[in-house]
């Protein structure tokens, strides 16, 4: 099965927590600011989305390259084999971010990337300049930092803190992955009682219970990869290891 360069994103300061989670699941990791890289196949995409408690998203790094002008950006994106990833009717919204780079206009970066992908797919699928975008969604992300561009596919969709178990929301509730991260920074492992004197909406207590019962935090939700037409729908992991 094909192996991908994957990475988890997380809130500021939680890199070491997510890194420890991934290593406990058996992955070799590399840490950057806001990202932890690891390799895996489709089963690992399912496993990490389902079981990681403290990450935000799991993305596939599709391509990395230097880009200091829009022509280079267009050509590098165009050169990728998009038909292998995107069906002809795919919706593919492009989110962009540019930091400390010559290409600093994020709307322009997004527009160029979108145009390059459309042009390539029109050529690959022998269309006449039109793509319907009526099918499933394949969220793409272009990030340029110090003139190094990375184009990625988001396998998660809504952030992993959206567990799916909360029916109603109180005022300013603590994010679920943040609560799990706080628990991971303590000795708590589910074998002894946890006292939360400021319960609020119960996020800490719920996340503690999930840890104690070894319940996957992604049990109640769907993910972007559920709609990828090349993704094996039979993959399911009931254990983080």
Question: What is the predicted function of each stretch?
Answer:
Residues 4-6, 90, 136-140, 147-149, ...:
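Structural beta-strand/beta-sheet cores of well-ordered domains, especially the beta-sheet scaffolds
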Residues 108-110, 157, 209-213:
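Short, glycine/charged-enriched secondary-structure capping and boundary segments
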Residues 65-67, 165, 170, 230-233:
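Short capping/connector residues at structural and topological boundaries
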Residues 44, 100, 148, 157, ...:
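Short loop/turn segments at secondary-structure transitions that flank enzyme active sites
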Residues 131-136, 143-163, 199:
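Catalytic cores of enzyme domains
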Residues 2-138:
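Non-catalytic nucleic-acid substrate-recognition regions in nucleic-acid-modifying enzymes
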Residues 174-239:
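Conserved S-adenosyl-L-methionine
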Residues 8-14, 149-189, 218:
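S-adenosyl-L-methionine
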């Amino acid at each position: 099965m094909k192996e991908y360069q994957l990475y988890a994103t997380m809130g500021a300061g939680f890199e070491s927590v997510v890194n420890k989670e991934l290593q406990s699941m058996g992955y070799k990791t590399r840490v950057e600011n806001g990202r932890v890289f690891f390799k895996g196949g489709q089963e690992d995409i399912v496993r990490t989305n389902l079981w990681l408690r403290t990450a935000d998203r799991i993305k596939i790094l599709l391509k990395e390259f230097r880009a200091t002008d829009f022509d280079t950006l267009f050509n590098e994106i165009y050169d990728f084999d998009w038909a292998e990833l995107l069906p002809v009717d795919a919706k593919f919204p492009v989110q962009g971010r540019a930091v400390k780079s010559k290409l600093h206009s994020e709307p322009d970066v997004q527009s160029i990337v979108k145009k390059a992908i459309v042009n390539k797919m029109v050529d690959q699928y022998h269309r006449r300049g039109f793509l319907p975008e009526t099918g499933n969604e394949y969220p793409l992300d272009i990030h340029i930092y110090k003139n190094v561009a990375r184009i990625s596919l988001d396998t998660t969709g809504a952030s992993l803190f959206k567990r799916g178990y909360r029916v109603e929301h109180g005022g300013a509730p603590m994010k679920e992955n943040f609560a799990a991260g706080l628990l991971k920074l303590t000795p708590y492992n589910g074998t002894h009682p946890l006292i939360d004197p400021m319960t609020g909406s119960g996020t800490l207590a719920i996340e503690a219970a999930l840890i104690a019962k070894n319940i996957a935090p992604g049990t109640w939700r769907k993910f972007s990869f559920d709609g990828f037409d090349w993704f094996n729908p039979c993959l399911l992991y009931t254990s983080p290891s």
